[in-house]
Every structure is written in structure tokens, then in C-alpha cells.
């Protein structure tokens, strides 16, 4: 996907259409959040400009060699402890390593590796965050599950710790809509933006699945 066109561009179109068709005053909106495809990998520069098209979740299987490389590096038993299964094309770690191995010039320019929802949130607020589910599951084992901080020794063969977004809960406030984002989306400047999450999590909440056992 072209993140600037397909993700951010379409988000702006949808946001403006919703506001226009609903007649809701943007200043009355208490908070907004984005959901998007899950374990994507999008490298961006310091201005949050995409450095290449996003590598999508399981349907993009280009990182087969990197999965083999990581399995040999860590051992299948250790990987099973982390994931409960072998590595697969849905995991972000092999995608980052693929960029490092095959597009070193892009890797060198990368400020952050983002998912779809974290990219939209960054475009709205200027802050780089990822929700706990995506951070701990899709980027496993690069974050410590107890502290939510990147683990330097595990990141070292893959990426720098500072290339990863900050983990927050999906409903935590990530920041406020910037002046530029307000002009592009029609939202009011200063509107709170939550961290957001992946599509399946948001779909569950929207259908009323909010308690254990539902």
C-alpha cells in the first residue's frame, strides 16, 4: 500500500465525508482514533514521510529468507517460547530485517517502523505510538512484555530501539490533532486522539464485544 495515498489520504476523505454527511460540529467531538490493518511494516523518516510502500501482514511473504535466518539465529524452541508457534509472514520482525537486508539505504533513513494505525495516529498528532496488542504481539520479542520498552539486545540484530514506537493502551491519549491535520481532515485542532488498534480489535469493540467471554 501507498501509505500517504491509501491510508492517510483515504482517512482524510472519510473524515471529511463523515463530518459533512452527519452535520456534527467538529468541536463537539470528544476524541478520535484509527484502526487499520494489523501487522504491517512502514518505515518513515523524521517528518513521518513514508520511505517505501508498506509491507502488509501475512499476504506479503517476501521475508521467507529472513524467517529462516531468524529461526537459525534464535532456534525454533526459543521462537516457540516467544510466539507459541514458528515465525510466519504475519510477524513484523522478519519484515524489518528484510528491509535491513535488501534496502539498506531505506533502513538507514528510517526514523520509525510503524503499523497502519500508528502511522495515522502519527499523522494526526506528530507522536509515534502503537497499542499494546500490536506492539507485544506483532513486534514480539522486540519489546519487554512487562515494561513495554524495547529490549536492546533483542533489537540489535533487527533495528535500533529508538526506531520503535512507544507502546500505550489502545484507548490512551496519544496526542492532539495538529493544525495541519485539522485542515486535512476537517477535525478540530486540539481534538484528543487515542492510540488506536488493529482492525479486528476495533471490529470486536464496535460489535459490543467488550467483556471476557463474549
Which stretches of residues belong to each language-model region?
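Short clusters of small/polar residues that mark proteolytic maturation junctions
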Residues: 55-56, 133
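Carbohydrate-associated surface elements
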Residues: 60
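Hinge/lid segment of periplasmic solute-binding proteins
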Residues: 64-75
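Short glycine/serine/threonine-rich phosphate/pyrophosphate-binding segments
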Residues: 36, 202-204
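Gly/Ser/Thr-rich active-site cleft segment
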Residues: 44, 79-200
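Alpha-helix C-terminal capping segments
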Residues: 206-212
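N-terminal glycine/serine-rich phosphate-binding loop of ATP-dependent small-molecule kinases
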Residues: 1-53, 65, 81, 109, ...
Amino acid at each position: 500500500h501507498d501509505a500517504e495515498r491509501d491510508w492517510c489520504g483515504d482517512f482524510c476523505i472519510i473524515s471529511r465525508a463523515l463530518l459533512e454527511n452527519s452535520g456534527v460540529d467538529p468541536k463537539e467531538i470528544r476524541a478520535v482514533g484509527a484502526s487499520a490493518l494489523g501487522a504491517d511494516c512502514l518505515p518513515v523518516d523524521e517528518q513521518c514521510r513514508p520511505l517505501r510502500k508498506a509491507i502488509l501482514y501475512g499476504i506479503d511473504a517476501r521475508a521467507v529468507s529472513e524467517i529462516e535466518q531468524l529461526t537459525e539465529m534464535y532456534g525454533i524452541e526459543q521462537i516457540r517460547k516467544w510466539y507459541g508457534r514458528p515465525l510466519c509472514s504475519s510477524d513484523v520482525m522478519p519484515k524489518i530485517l528484510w528491509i535491513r537486508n535488501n534496502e539498506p539505504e531505506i533502513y538507514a533513513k528510517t526514523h520509525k517502523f510503524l503499523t497502519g494505525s500508528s502511522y495515522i495516529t502519527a499523522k494526526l498528532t506528530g507522536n509515534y505510538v502503537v497499542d499494546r496488542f500490536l506492539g507485544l504481539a506483532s513486534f514480539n520479542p522486540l519489546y519487554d512484555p512487562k515494561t513495554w520498552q524495547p529490549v536492546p539486545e533483542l533489537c540489535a540484530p533487527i533495528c535500533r530501539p529508538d526506531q520503535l514506537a512507544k507502546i500505550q493502551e489502545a484507548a490512551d491519549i496519544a496526542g492532539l490533532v495538529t493544525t495541519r491535520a485539522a485542515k486535512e481532515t476537517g477535525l478540530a485542532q486540539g481534538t484528543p486522539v487515542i492510540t488506536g488498534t488493529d482492525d479486528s480489535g476495533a471490529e470486536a469493540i464496535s460489535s459490543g464485544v467488550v467483556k471476557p467471554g463474549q
